[in-house]
Amino acid sequence: MAPSVTLPLTTAILAIARLVAAQQPGTSTPEVHPKLTTYKCTKSGGCVAQDTSVVLDWNYRWMHDANYNSCTVNGGVNTTLCPDEATCGKNCFIEGVDYAASGVTTSGSSLTMNQYMPSSSGGYSSVSPRLYLLDSDGEYVMLKLNGQELSFDVDLSALPCGENGSLYLSQMDENGGANQYNTAGANYGSGYCDAQCPVQTWRNGTLNTSHQGFCCNEMDILEGNSRANALTPHSCTATACDSAGCGFNPYGSGYKSYYGPGDTVDTSKTFTIITQFNTDNGSPSGNLVSITRKYQQNGVDIPSAQPGGDTISSCPSASAYGGLATMGKALSSGMVLVFSIWNDNSQYMNWLDSGNAGPCSSTEGNPSNILANNPNTHVVFSNIRWGDIGSTTNSTAPPPPPASSTTFSTTRRSSTTSSSPSCTQTHWGQCGGIGYSGCKTCTSGTTCQYSNDYYSQCL
């Protein structure tokens, strides 16, 4: 079977329909973006559904010439086919993708992303997709969130230590850097940048013959798994960024029983994340002065981890890059919503969920462990909403606690006295491990299963 006919980089996007119609049955891979309904909200008008979809990143695609010779090789481009931008644009075609095989499925307002997919040769392959939110015209949705809020539901229960389910904002161009040699642009996932200044084969849609990094402001709304999470702004100048950022991680801030399976934010179940970008005058025209994180679960507001709220109001590491004011300007001009799932072969994601950052051991996040024990690891994002602060969720105060309990505790719960009967851990909750002193009896229908010396879980 011949490879599919695809979009030439120099062919207008409007020609896509004609190219698809000319393809032979069973031989083509057209670019069909999975629909993902999102919502734009106002206090006066409520939330209105948006006609949006997702598109897979440009670098995940096959590029080839008319004879199906690859235009890319390990470490860059085929210099015979791509000696310069104009020749590359003339010679090379870019494929559409099979989204389901790439670990991406959508249903209504819900997006599921898998780390691994079954391989045709047996076993599993790491697909680790990265996606961008696209409008009905084939350009990126530009979220202008200064003085606004962003809310979404997320299910991280299937993400173990070492996995990172991410939802963040990147200051990419609306058209993905489309130009005369790359008319595919955003419609094919072009133009990625972030605060790590990645060096890619294409830089904002242009062949990167000078091997420059591509820096831009990055606002990490969520980097997390079922054990830890972080909220982190990364401000940039044109050529450099605050790559480390100044984030808030509940565990890293000392609130070690706030976030996790069975904890205050119970990651064994779906929950809602609300992120508010507060300005000095309370409107989108003001200067960004703080970023606030809130949670809901089962429609009920969850108390913040920190007294006074989980808020980032200063960013010393970003002072050389303009601090929060720079991020506010990026949020005002518009940023692209990015979704990803990934793991880390070198550092095992320890910066996110191990040591001072989380409860995971230094080796739990090894991708070989993840694949062996959690080949179906995935994240689900749903009900993505943005708009006026206070417009994207229905807030309900938490019920009053029983007389014998407190509203919030910074230490893991245990039985109240040494003579009390054993407490019962919930499904997915921790039930054993070195240093663990909490509930060791699992709820009915589950048993305490060993994962490693530091962690056993009710399954």
From Swiss-Prot:
**Pyrrolidone carboxylic acid: modified positions:** 23
- Point out the annotated site residues (description: Not glycosylated): 164, 208, 281
Q: Where is this region: Disordered?
A: 390-425
Q: How does the record describe the protein's post-translational processing?
A: Asn-204 contains mainly a high-mannose-type glycan (Hex(7-9)GlcNAc(2)), with a small fraction (8%) bearing a single GlcNAc at this site.
Provide the glycosylation site positions.
Answer: 78, 204, 394
Q: From the UniProt entry, list the residue stretches annotated as the region Catalytic.
A: 23-397
- From the Swiss-Prot or TrEMBL record, state where the protein is found: Secreted
The identity of this protein, by name, is Endoglucanase EG-1
Pfam name, any one: CBM_1
